[in-house]
Amino acid sequence: IDGCVDIANEVGTAKIGDPYDLFIHNNEEKALYAVESWYSWHSREDYRNNIYSIRNAYYGTRTGAISELSLSKAVAAVNANLDTEVKKAIDDAAAAIWAIPSPFRNNINSPEAVSAMEACATLEGVLKGSLKSCIEGIDKTVLAEVVKNYVDVVVLPTYSDLKAGNQALF
């Protein structure tokens, strides 16, 4: 789950937060260049997709459906309220990012950008706090099945798609 914690932190504090901090300190040009994907106008999509990667890891699928062999199901079996909290934090972060007016490069200091940073911080806190300690108490054989499912259903197909997409470029 540490990778998911890192992603939530990076989206909130670096990808949105760094340009925001530069902008509010009157470094507007540097703020613009600090925006990831500013030239393609797809920053919000990239940031939301980062949050979706957390969702994919937690749900054990790439579709938004929850696998029976997911971390979500394993957590729900021991703490249904925590599972609901994690899912809400993921959904809230993705929605807050999408609520930033498009393009992000023209709305760096918007109230919605601040809300997105806060939602990412909340997600990070839930992941590295309650969720991490809950996972430590889940049976290792259950977690092994969750990891196997994640690798087989999320990781390997993702890399296969990336490889195919890369080959299509040439």
Show which residues each predicted segment covers:
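Mature extracytoplasmic or organellar-lumen-exposed domains after removal of signal/transit peptides
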Residues: I1-F170
